[in-house]
From Swiss-Prot:
Belongs to the FAD-dependent oxidoreductase family. Its main location: cytoplasm. One of at least two accessory proteins for anaerobic nitric oxide (NO) reductase. Reduces the rubredoxin moiety of NO reductase. GO terms for cellular component: cytoplasm. Its cofactor is FAD. This is Nitric oxide reductase FlRd-NAD(+) reductase. It comes from the Bacteria. NCBIfam families: PRK04965.1 (NF003437). It is found in: Cytoplasm. Keywords: Cytoplasm, FAD, Flavoprotein, NAD, Oxidoreductase.
Length: 377
């Protein structure tokens, strides 16, 4: 490959892919282009920055230049890719262009901000760059509204509460983690957050944010008003697909790829939070790590279909940590819950009596690995 491989993006997926490529080929030309600084940080740490009094710069693990030297790369930080000419195999920015043999989209996902009046007052914590932009406000804030009771919202609510802040956690659903598990399973976390002092506003919808003398006034659809110092959107992620769409690639929720991580164009691939693998968007670390292993082989001339085993997802809520695995969101499962003082095991069983999902908390989390082996692949 005389022109080599170009990767657009510099997050976890891009870095894992670089490491896997270099394990197999030390010399193929590798170029990374990204809009950020390309310094490495651990994105899950963003869920704990406030309680641990970390500044954005504290999260940096490796500078971009060190990464480039270690893995023999060309890096183009702070560079927005404007267009891809898929037929000509050319990537274009405003003032540069690069030719490639193979192209990988690792463009990630953007935080979704609800389309309410005053949405510009809402903060997001989806990157080191976003945290850097709002860290002074967040550290000073005493009253915090978090909109969204999913994984990130629950993690942030616990973290801000542990830091001594007054936290209101709001969601349209009747329970936390509603898209991941039934309320009888998530209720243990819900009670723990309430016991810690988090104010839950479930079955509630944000209608408007506006500046007030006391900070920010949040008005709910019920017309209840809450005065806060900061409002955070934790209402999910949307895969970054605009560049792929302009290149003429097939898009659904994410950039559509097959088991080889190949898009609708044979020389363009996608990985990470932007990719939709055979109909599934999997924005978790383990599937990204495995995707990087297989994609590296495919980029270097192999033909290795991605095989994903049953995988654990960890909810990073230190006062009540959780593992979940399998099809926890299925509505037709029968849940068998054993809850004791040291933790909980909830097993989701099919009508045929087969284990299809489970959730484990606290000291019972050590049982998760044995249960994982019982899940169908």
């Amino acid at each position: 490959m005389s022109r080599g491989i170009i990767i657009i993006g510099s997050g976890f997926a891009a870095r894992q892919l670089v490491k896997n490529i270099r394990k197999q080929d030390a010399h193929v030309p590798l170029t990374l282009i990204a809009a950020d600084s390309m310094d490495e940080y651990n994105k899950p740490d963003l869920s704990h920055v406030i309680s641990q009094s970390q500044r954005a710069d504290d999260l940096t693990r490796q500078l971009a230049g060190e990464f480039a030297e270690q893995f023999n790369l060309r890096l183009f930080p702070h560079t927005w890719v404007a267009d891809i000419d898929a037929d000509a195999h050319v990537v274009k920015s405003q003032d540069k262009q690069w030719q490639y043999d193979k192209l990988v989209l690792a463009t990630g996902a953007a935080a979704f901000v609800p389309p309410v009046a005053g949405r510009e007052l809402m903060l997001t914590l989806n990157s080191q760059q976003e945290y850097r932009a709002c860290e002074t406000q967040l550290r000073a804030a005493q009253r915090v509204l978090i909109v969204g009771g999913g994984l990130i919202g629950s993690e942030l609510a616990m973290d801000f509460c542990r830091a001594g802040k007054t936290v209101t956690l709001m969601d349209n659903a009747a329970s936390l983690l509603a898209s991941l598990m039934p309320p009888e399973v998530s209720s243990r976390l819900q009670h723990r957050l309430t016991d810690m002092g988090v104010h839950l506003q479930l079955k509630s919808q944000l209608q408007e944010l506006e500046k007030s003398e006391a900070g920010i006034r949040a008005t709910l659809a019920s017309q209840r008003r809450i005065e806060v110092d900061a409002a955070i959107a934790a209402t999910g992620l949307r895969p970054e697909t605009a560049l792929a769409r302009r290149a003429g690639l097939v898009i659904n929720h994410g950039v559509c790829v097959d088991s080889y991580l190949q898009t609708s164009h044979p020389d363009i691939y996608a990985i990470g939070d932007c990719a939709e693998i055979n109909g599934q968007v999997l924005p978790f670390l383990q599937p990204i790590q495995l995707s990087a292993m297989y994609l590296a082989k495919n980029l270097l001339g192999g033909k290795a279909p991605l095989k994903l085993p049953a995988m654990l997802v960890k909810v990073k809520t230190p006062e009540l940590p959780l593992y979940l695995a399998g099809e926890t969101q299925r509505r037709d499962l029968s849940w068998h819950i054993t809850a004791e003082s040291d933790g909980m095991i909830a097993k989701g069983m099919s009508g045929e009596g087969q284990l299809r999902a489970f959730v484990a908390s606290e000291d019972r989390m050590k049982e998760a690995f044995a249960l994982l082996k019982m899940l169908p692949v």
